């Protein structure tokens, strides 16, 4: 029994898996959630980031430098991919899907030619663990959790509170109108794709020390990335975090009692049910809010408030 009573001894792994689900889907939030590109090469950007960390580690012995260079490498390749191939395919979803699928296969084959199919290992930059309230917490897993929280907070702030975020949201919602406002839509799309690719590369580098690295590394995360973004709602960062908590938490808890294969199947079923029920839940929530707003508006003094709201500001007269 742990200090928290009802939690299993290694329940910190629940938090870690939620962070992992959030981290792997955060890059896809840009390429698929915002740009609506069914990016089947998303897993390969994690792969590129992981192998960048491995290569730098082999060349210099400095895995931290490799992790820092991983998003640079993945982001650069993301720009090249967007400018060279996807630029003309935004209105052709099937063609973009086939293009990203082909690039994913090519990337895996190139990695296998360069590094073989033999498993590789990226060192844990910190090593060791510590105990908190009876939990054995590996330092590197704590780093993953902290990095995920920081990335989500940073992305949320950038998209909600900066000029870049305003332009990005305008580009995503109405590209034609954004162009009339002087926004370079092509450049914004390239920037968003590069950011998504860079975050995926960083995710791959951060996750490499706790996984075996081989050319199939990216495929481990591809399906769950799409599940999180789809269940959370395309373009919704808050929904992404909630979906990651539901799916990652469910998978981690189920693995305590059943095999990983059956746990993943149940998570898939949860995702399907979530997508199916989400419109119904959204409609009921909207209806509840409308009734609550109406009830508040019909309270004492509501007529006076309504007249006050309709009255012209002080010093102004309607013609």
Model-derived regions: residue spans:
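Cytosolic-side transmembrane-helix boundaries in multi-pass membrane proteins
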Residues: 6, 95, 114, 173-180, ...
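Inter-helical junctions in multi-pass inner-membrane proteins, predominant
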Residues: 2-14, 155-163, 190-232, 251-264
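Hydrophobic alpha-helical transmembrane segments of polytopic membrane proteins
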Residues: 23, 28, 74-76, 224-252, ...
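Transmembrane helix-bundle core of multi-pass membrane transporters
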Residues: 84, 88-161, 188-191, 288-319
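Short, non-helical or kinked segments that cap or interrupt transmembrane helices
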Residues: 28-50, 91-96, 164-167, 185, ...
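Alpha-helical transmembrane segments within multi-pass membrane transporters and channels
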Residues: 28, 61-104, 110, 242-247
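Helix-loop-helix "hairpin" substructures at the membrane interface of multi-pass membrane proteins
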Residues: 17, 133-214, 237-242
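Single transmembrane alpha-helix segments in multi-pass membrane proteins
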Residues: 6-56, 80-95, 231-234
């Amino acid at each position: 029994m742990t200090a928290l009573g009802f939690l299993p001894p290694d329940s910190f792994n629940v938090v870690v898996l939620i962070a992992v689900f959030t981290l792997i889907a955060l890059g896809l939030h840009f390429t698929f959630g915002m740009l609506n590109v069914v990016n089947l090469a998303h897993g390969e950007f994690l792969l590129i980031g992981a192998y960048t960390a491995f290569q730098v580690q082999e060349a210099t012995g400095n895995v931290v430098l490799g992790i820092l260079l991983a998003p640079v490498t993945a982001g650069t390749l993301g720009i090249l991919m967007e400018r060279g191939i996807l630029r003309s395919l935004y209105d052709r979803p099937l063609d973009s899907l086939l293009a990203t699928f082909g690039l994913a296969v090519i990337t895996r084959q190139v990695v296998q030619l360069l590094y073989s199919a033999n498993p590789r290992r990226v060192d844990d930059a910190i090593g060791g663990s510590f105990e908190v309230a009876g939990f054995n917490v590996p330092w590197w897993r704590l780093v993953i959790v902290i990095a995920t929280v920081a990335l989500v907070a940073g992305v949320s702030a950038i998209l909600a509170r900066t000029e870049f975020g305003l332009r990005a949201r305008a580009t995503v919602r109405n590209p034609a109108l954004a162009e009339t406002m002087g926004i370079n839509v092509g450049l914004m799309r390239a920037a968003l794709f590069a950011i998504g690719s860079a975050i995926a590369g960083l995710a791959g580098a951060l996750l490499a020390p706790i996984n075996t690295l081989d050319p199939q590394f990216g495929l481990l995360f591809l399906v769950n990335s799409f599940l999180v973004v789809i269940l959370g709602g395309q373009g919704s960062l808050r929904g992404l975090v909630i979906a990651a908590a539901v799916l990652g938490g469910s998978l981690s808890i189920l693995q305590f009692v059943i095999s990983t294969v059956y746990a993943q199947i149940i998570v898939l079923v949860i995702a399907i049910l979530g997508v199916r029920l989400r419109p119904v839940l959204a409609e009921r929530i909207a209806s509840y809010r409308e009734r609550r707003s109406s009830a508040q508006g019909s309270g004492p003094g509501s007529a006076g408030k309504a007249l006050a709201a309709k009255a012209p500001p002080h010093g102004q007269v309607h013609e």
